[in-house]
Amino acid sequence: MNILIVCNHFYPHNRIATFRLNAFARYFREAGHSVTVITEGDRDETAMWNGCEVHYVKDPVITSSKQESLLQRRKKWAFRRILSALQFRLFLDYKRIWQFKACKKARKLAKSRQFDVVLSSYGHLSSHRIAYRLHRKMPFYWIADMRDETSGRTGQRLVLVLK
């Protein structure tokens, strides 16, 4: 089975979201499936990781490593950070511009191989938007992983509002 994973966080980043998606990819591969990953990277490149083909797509606005270095140097108002914040306020997604580049890459890959399953993971909304755009054009099973999106006390707040 051909599986495509679309996410913002993947190896070599050191985050909780990365560990979860690395595990998905590794265990799918160990089960005998062909795994392709589209994720955010510092440059546009393709690499192999544990038998999985990983396509890194650079965000033209600001890469994750650049943003982390700005935060560590306590630079709050760098032009790229302002542009990233503006994207969020306009589209509710920091990675809206990255989404278009990644979607183009996903379409190109989908034309060359037929994906049976696409797994998109919430880190930014853009990964789900990419999977949705692909799903409108091509038949496959779509798994939208929301992670801990609604693990908070949302129900209790709703009760308080209704009282």
Question: Which residues does each predicted region cover?
Answer:
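Histidine-centered beta-alpha loop that forms part of the nucleotide-sugar donor binding/catalytic region
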Residues: 8-10, 122-123, 146-149
